[in-house]
Regions:
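Non-transmembrane "mature" sequence context
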Residues: 1-98
């Protein structure tokens, strides 16, 4: 469950950069940290909403018409997109049509 290595590379930090920073014992940048926290927040909220990590993972990767055919995980790359995903998950949690 959770983000794959490829998704971390795509959405947070490229693997080569991550390895280079680890070798030099350097932290993530503020932007990288923000992206990592944002994606962890959405992952956690989806798991809480669906009460099932596998359902949450499938939903996060599902292309949704409501998002113009994009997957929630893709939309959540920005803070504004994350707020949209949080709103949709809130509607799902409260039983409204998402």
């Amino acid at each position: 469950a959770g983000l794959s290595e490829q998704e971390i590379e795509r959405f947070v930090i490229p693997q080569r950069t991550r390895r280079h920073r680890a070798e030099k014992n350097e932290p993530l940048t503020v932007e990288e940290s923000d992206r990592a926290v944002r994606l962890a927040r959405i992952q956690s909220l989806a798991e809480e909403t669906f009460d099932d990590p596998e359902k949450a993972n499938r939903w996060l990767r599902m292309e949704l018409a409501e998002l113009g055919g994009e997957a929630p995980l893709t939309v959540a790359q920005t803070e504004a997109g994350t707020r949209v995903i949080e709103t949709i998950l809130g509607k799902i949690a409260w039983g409204a049509a998402a």
